[in-house]
Amino acid sequence: MILDESIQFGNKKLLLVLAVPESVCGNNKALTYSDLTTLVLKVSASWKSEDIALELPLHIDLEQIAYCISDNGSNLTCAFKSLNLKHIMDVNHQFSLIIKSVFENNVLFNNYTKALSLFRAQKSLSKIARIVSPNQRIMSRFMNFTPLFQWGIKMIILLDNNKLTQEEETALSFLKPYRSFIFDTYQILIRLNNMQKFLKNNGFSDKNAKEAMSLFSDMNSNNSLKIKEQLEAYFADLSSKTEDNKTICCSSDIIESCFSRYKAIVKGNKSVGISDLCLCIAAMLGENNLDKTRCAMETVKMKRLKEWNAKNISKTLFAEKKELNKILTEFIC
């Protein structure tokens, strides 16, 4: 089972719970929409652990749940704990936490990123703008800063081969003290990205963990050793939750993809908040989803849809504003 809550839409959040057959894990491919079944699609102003723990048993026999995949949100993890469910930490979020723990207070890293910010601010509109570094993420900055080091590698290669103008070489002179740090960090990030891709496609097992760790066999810098130590701890935790010779899924990327698809559909009118249009998520999941959706649209009555809406969506932000304006109109008139 995969769970997550959406980002804030207006004043509400959407809880999405997906069921995944164990048989589709470890088939040399990442999960797809056809592998999923929607269990819960419900809106609330907030989702506390108690709310989630009460909701899950209403939709599935807990004995059917082998494990739950999610990020490390306290509301989700506490809900799993109260229901005695195994929690598998999503590999993407876990790797992000590992990277953060190693680099957040690293002097070289902080000085390098500050230097890039200053360089970008000074040169983005100049005649040497072609060599300006990419923007840094503000939110979840440790989930993907590979582009910053990829850019650094490219600039060093151009400098080493005298392919830049004198002005560009002078502007990039600040990179010299970070040369070895850039190369080492880039190698760490490339290996982590490859490891993540391998685990998303092949799932986690003790055998796959050994193969994944082999990607770091030739790395022995201080930062890489710190990364390896935490990876081993993460894999040990997953191993303790995995039955012998079994492969489990360890990525919740697919649920993030569902939210992204929904956001793309409603992006033109976010002020409405979360409406029954979120049913588009359920419509795009499962096998033969097109035929099933067509059948549902032809057979489900509006009365039933309104009942579902009242129970799971309640009033949208747009409806609340409309109601308030109606009250205001009565006073003005």
Where are these regions (language model features)?
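Acidic/histidine-rich catalytic cores and adjacent linkers
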Residues: 73-82, 95, 120-333
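A catalytic-pocket lid/entrance helix-loop region that shapes and gates access to the active site
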Residues: 105-116
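Conserved His + Asp/Glu catalytic blocks
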Residues: 98
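RNase H-like nuclease fold core
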Residues: 1-68, 74, 78-93, 101-107, ...
